[in-house]
Amino acid sequence: MSTIEERVKKIIGEQLGVKQEEVVNTASFVEDLGADSLDTVELVMALEEEFDTEIPDEEAEKITTVQAAIDYINGHQA
């Protein structure tokens, strides 16, 4: 089984259509990876599905970087 970090990065790459090597922990979805607001909503939905969790809107708004997504999932896994 892949690590959470690997799974999160794979989803981000697929959702945003960027090369895996561009998905570094410090990358901002909007500024570095070219996401728009719809992309970020779809990304959160993909993360929710992959990790069988629900990310409240107020939390989703704080997830703006690759590392923030990894940290959120790590902190909310059963």
From Swiss-Prot:
- List the GO molecular function terms: acyl binding; acyl carrier activity
Listed A to Z, the keywords are: Cytoplasm, Fatty acid biosynthesis, Fatty acid metabolism, Lipid biosynthesis, Lipid metabolism, Phosphopantetheine, Phosphoprotein
Q: How is it modified after translation?
A: 4'-phosphopantetheine is transferred from CoA to a specific serine of apo-ACP by AcpS. This modification is essential for activity because fatty acids are bound in thioester linkage to the sulfhydryl of the prosthetic group.
Query: Which InterPro entries does the UniProt entry name for this protein?
Result: ACP (IPR003231), ACP-like_sf (IPR036736), PP-bd_ACP (IPR009081), Ppantetheine_attach_site (IPR006162)
* Keyword set includes Cytoplasm: yes
**Compartments (UniProt record):** Cytoplasm
O-(pantetheine 4'-phosphoryl)serine-modified residues are where?
A: 37
Q: What is its main location?
A: cytoplasm
Instruction: Relate the protein's function as given in its record.
Output: Carrier of the growing fatty acid chain in fatty acid biosynthesis.
Name the UniProt record assigns to this protein: Acyl carrier protein
* Species annotation: Erwinia tasmaniensis (strain DSM 17950 / CFBP 7177 / CIP 109463 / NCPPB 4357 / Et1/99)
| Gene designation per UniProt | acpP
